[in-house]
Amino acid sequence: KRQDPTAIGSEPILSTDSMSHWRRCMQGHSASNLVPVVAANRVGEERVEPCAENAGQSSSLVFYGSSFITDGCGEIQISMGRQEEGFIAATFDLDQLMEDRLSWGLFRDRRPEMYGKLL
């Protein structure tokens, strides 16, 4: 059975390294919603063997790891290296996070009842 990659890895343009862009995007999601984010990524290489589904082509993907956890403002609290396997954890004061969300007013003008279906 074919399994597609489920993490960020090799680039379509070989001279590009999107790791820092990926981190900044995730930090932005955290900051814009005032919630901590746990961003997990694989490490190592995954080889794609020739099969009918890929027209007999082989390739490989190199995953750049670099998993991290942000606080509610998007600041990285703890991170891992590109080849580092393991676990990381962080503790947050949930009451303080809720207070921060309420005091910033980021959600005040959102109107979810007006959102249409995506699909």
Task: Describe the function of each predicted region.
Residues 1-87:
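CN hydrolase (nitrilase-like) catalytic-core segments centered on the catalytic cysteine
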Residues 42, 97-119:
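Cysteine/selenocysteine-centered motifs that mediate thiol-based redox chemistry or coordinate metal-sulfur cofactors
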Residues 84-102:
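A short, polar/charged loop-to-alpha-helix boundary motif
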Residues 52, 89, 109-111:
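A generic membrane alpha-helix/interface feature
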